[in-house]
Every structure is written in structure tokens, then in C-alpha cells.
């Protein structure tokens, strides 16, 4: 199996210049390939990866585009493969039509592949094609590296995301089952009666973020001080993102390791974000990313993920007798008593138990 491990790297000035040169060349080739495929489509021609790769070879022969020879050649080819994958995802209706890349995008990355051991970690350094040895902050040991994505973030930092082979550790509970009901106040409640609070990282950083953004708005446009302040704002956002990702990684790993079967609600998160009263809170808790982590980690450990339909009334149904109480549509009701069997329910715990029951029912159907 494969997974990505992200480490921070510290290139020197010359290496930074090369990284940005390669980023620019990859963006140029990607956009050139996209324009070629778009024009071909309009003229009824079928343009694929092989045609765009031949285009790259021809461009390198022209003196006007001699700068392409200085970049990482593997990275240029990978940008065309990424473009091809974008079209595959578009035609299979998994993504929208590929867009042109802008140099004004503050987040930039390129991918390069390990060939003949030209990517490896040696002590406190990582060897990368054409970059040589770059200082790396390595927090764990890695085996053979398949490929690397070099990232430059809006906060001005550089990272290497290593794709490596790994063997997942055995689960602590091979037969466990659990239902998960996500929320805003509590990040999720489970069918065992546990509740995990929403850490609200963005809300906790909002005062500092507003202060830094206010300072940014006062800086003169295109000035050096404005760029320094922009980086300060980006670092606040980056800290919130890192805190949230760490929380999601730990919660998803714990659930997958401790349970064989996980039942979740198949929420239309994009549709829910259209509600302007809840959009900020929903985006902040990152349910979609949490579900995505559960899915790919379940693939590692051989777990089963069952998605219960959105329209299933998990909160309104009594988990003891099955009575449906339409009065519970009111989101303000957190504790309720079943009129039929008189069981007292916590709204979220009851919903998670019903999600588990429905998911197991779908599994056996």
C-alpha cells in the first residue's frame, strides 16, 4: 500500500530559485497542453497525453523555449500526466473541466518521480532531481520513495510530500461496529454514547486573524511591507489548517483502527454550505475531509464504510422502538422522550445508533 508523508524542507537561495523556475515551467507546459487539447476538441481532433508529450519534446528543440531544458524534465512530464488525469476525472464526472493555472496562485506544487534512486533521504537531507541535497525536517523513518511533490505555500514555506510504500498496523478491534453522527456543536457523537467536541480552531484564531487582516488592508499595494504582512495573515490560516488536519487525522485513525464497520450519513456537504447561516460553521468543521480520510484509511485496514441516505430520519426515529417523532425536526430539541416507549434520548447519540442500525441493515441486504 502507499501513503503520503509530508515533511518541511529548507532549500537555500539557489535551490529556491530552481524550485520556482520549475514551478513556472510546469505551469507553462500544463497551460500549453490544456490549450492544445481545448483547441483539438473544438476542431474535432482527439488529443491525449502522447500528443501533448510530443508537443513538449518539440518545444524543447526551439531556441525560444530553451528555458525548459533547465527545469526538472520528469516534473514537466508529470504536469502533462496530471492534465490527462484531470480530463479523465472530468469525463467520468468526478471533477469539473480543467482550468488554466495562474502564477498569482499563492499555493504552487510540482511532482517528480524516483528513477534509479535519484530521490532518497541521507541523514538530515533529501536528494532531489536537479536540486541536489536539501535540508529536511524528518519526523519519522520512511522506506523506498516512489515520488515526491514539492510544495510552496502561501506562508512562504516549502514542503516535500513523499509517496511511500507501507504496511498498516493491525487493528486493535477487528470486529467493532460504530455509527457516527456529525454535528457543529459536537464534531461527532457515536453509537457508544461518546461525544467528541468541535475544537473550533478558526473561531479561536478569529480575533488575531481580523487584526492581521486589518493591518494588511492599511499597507501600500505592491510594497515590501504588504508582502510581509500578507505572509503573516497566511501563517494564521496555515496554523488553523494544520491544527484541523491533525485533529481529523487522529480521529479518523482511531475510528478505523478500533472498528471493522463504520456507518456514516451520506451528507450533501456542498448543498448544506449554501445555507448562509450555517455555511461558515460547516466549512470550519470539514466533514467532507473527515469522511474522505475515513474512506481511504478503511481501504488500508480492510474496513467497511456504509453511507446511510441523507433523507433517512435518524434524529426523529426512536432507537429503542422505531417510533418516528416529527416534532424532533426542530433542531433546538436536544433531549426528547419517546411518546410510545418513553425512552429518553440525546438527539445526537440516538441519531448515531439509528445510523449504525441502518448501515448494518444495508450491509446484510
Regions found by a protein language model. Give the residues of each.
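Nucleic-acid substrate recognition interfaces
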Residues: 1-365
